């Protein structure tokens, strides 16, 4: 997390990073979100539908209901016990939404969408940081962020979905791995393991990177082991309930 001093003696490196990375990333993410939501609003109007309803369709309903009622109290229509459906969704995102909405007194759906705006900015910034590591110039970095945040179905970045959060965690994990900052990578992947099952791919890449670049570094292997804890823990916990 980047904190920027607002005093007259702000760190020049921090101020430079803000201008070169986070401001362009915010512009890319916010303009992209405005375009996507604007296009969806046009479609909604043409079909006599409601934009808010479209933004909360599909799995978005499940995430919002888990945020409201938890795995066992979600108001979701199912053929069996509700947790047999809700436990397909990892807890990181809905419970973060629940915590923030409780603190701010805001609705879960709106909170989720607002959080995803911030996560989209972090995703765009991560793409730019990775492009910079690869030696790309400023405009190539910005274009890379545009391509990633405007991929097909990127409207989910503006819905109560996990793609923006997971994408941000994944890209910053890769940035850390390329820089051989093993414990920073472990922290990102640890959190990603609370968000989506696909965090297993990040763990696999982490292990491969350590094998290739730091195979004799026990601290790096400890970081790999640490990163997988929430993923394994949630699968064990949910499986224990689904066996009942």
Task: Go through each PLM region and give its residues.
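Membrane-lumen/periplasm interface segments of specific transmembrane helices
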Residues: 31-50, 55, 199, 203-244
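Loop-to-helix entry region of an early transmembrane alpha helix in multi-pass inner-membrane enzymes
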Residues: 81-82, 91, 95, 103-125
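Short acidic/glycine- and proline-prone juxtamembrane loop motifs at membrane-interface regions
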Residues: 158-165
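Membrane-interface alpha helices of multi-pass inner-membrane proteins
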Residues: 149, 170-175, 183-210, 225-231
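Transmembrane-helix signature of polytopic, membrane-embedded enzymes
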Residues: 107-110, 127-150, 168
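Extracytosolic helix-loop segments that constitute the early lumenal/periplasmic catalytic or substrate-binding loops
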Residues: 46-47, 57-83, 92, 243
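Hydrophobic transmembrane alpha-helices
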Residues: 97, 101, 124-128, 132, ...
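Start-transfer (signal-anchor) and selected internal transmembrane alpha helices
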Residues: 1-46, 132, 219, 223
């Amino acid at each position: 997390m980047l904190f920027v001093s607002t005093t007259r003696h702000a760190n020049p490196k921090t101020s430079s990073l803000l201008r070169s990375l986070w401001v362009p990333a915010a512009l890319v993410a916010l303009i992209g979100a405005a375009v996507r939501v604007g296009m969806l609003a046009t479609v909604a109007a043409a079909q006599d539908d409601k934009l808010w309803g479209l933004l909360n369709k599909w799995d978005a309903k499940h995430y919002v209901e888990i945020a409201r009622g938890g795995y066992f109290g979600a108001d979701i229509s199912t053929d069996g016990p509700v947790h047999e459906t809700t436990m397909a969704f990892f807890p990181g995102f809905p419970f973060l939404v629940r915590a923030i909405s409780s603190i701010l007194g805001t609705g879960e759906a709106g909170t989720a969408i607002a959080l995803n705006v911030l996560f989209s900015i972090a995703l765009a910034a991560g793409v730019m940081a990775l492009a910079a590591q690869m030696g790309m110039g400023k405009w190539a970095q910005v274009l890379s962020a545009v391509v990633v945040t405007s991929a097909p179905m990127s409207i989910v970045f503006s819905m109560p979905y996990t793609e923006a959060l997971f994408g941000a965690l994944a890209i910053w994990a890769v940035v850390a791995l390329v820089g051989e900052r093993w414990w920073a990578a472990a922290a990102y992947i640890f959190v990603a393991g609370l968000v989506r099952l696909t965090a297993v791919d990040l763990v696999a890449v982490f292990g491969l990177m350590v094998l290739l670049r730091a195979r004799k570094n026990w601290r790096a292997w400890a970081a790999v082991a640490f990163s997988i804890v929430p993923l394994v823990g949630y699968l064990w916990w949910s499986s224990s309930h689904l066996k009942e």
